[in-house]
Amino acid sequence: MGEKDIIRDLYEVILDRRQKQPDGSYTAYLFEQGEDKILKKIGEEAAEVLIAAKNGGGAALVGEMADLVYHLLVLLAWHGLAPEDVLAELAARRQKKS
């Protein structure tokens, strides 16, 4: 699995966990708890990103950003959206500025 495909690969795992709801799966737990729990986790992870950045960044910042991206992907799945939807929006915005 290359770095280029990691977002898509992770998103596919999220979708699989949502569908199959395996015991002990954190992702399945988030879907079971619902949107409010997912949003709460995004808020917590965003705050942790800010703290890691203020504390000098580095590996801690990378780790917290990875946690935030994961939870954002869960939210996309909750709403029936895909990472490509966000990428398409970013590309469209870039085209407008060029």
Curated annotation (Swiss-Prot):
Pathway(s) the chain acts in: Amino-acid biosynthesis; L-histidine biosynthesis; L-histidine from 5-phospho-alpha-D-ribose 1-diphosphate: step 2/9
> GO molecular function, one example?
ATP binding
Decide whether keyword Disulfide bond is in the record.
no
- Family annotation (Pfam families): PRA-PH
Task: List the GO cellular component terms.
Answer: cytoplasm
Task: Report the record's Gene Ontology biological process terms.
Answer: L-histidine biosynthetic process
Reactions performed catalytically = 1-(5-phospho-beta-D-ribosyl)-ATP + H2O = 1-(5-phospho-beta-D-ribosyl)-5'-AMP + diphosphate + H(+)
Q: Which family does it belong to?
A: Belongs to the PRA-PH family.
Q: What is this protein called?
A: Phosphoribosyl-ATP pyrophosphatase
Query: Species name for this entry?
Result: Pelotomaculum thermopropionicum (strain DSM 13744 / JCM 10971 / SI)
- Gene of this entry: hisE
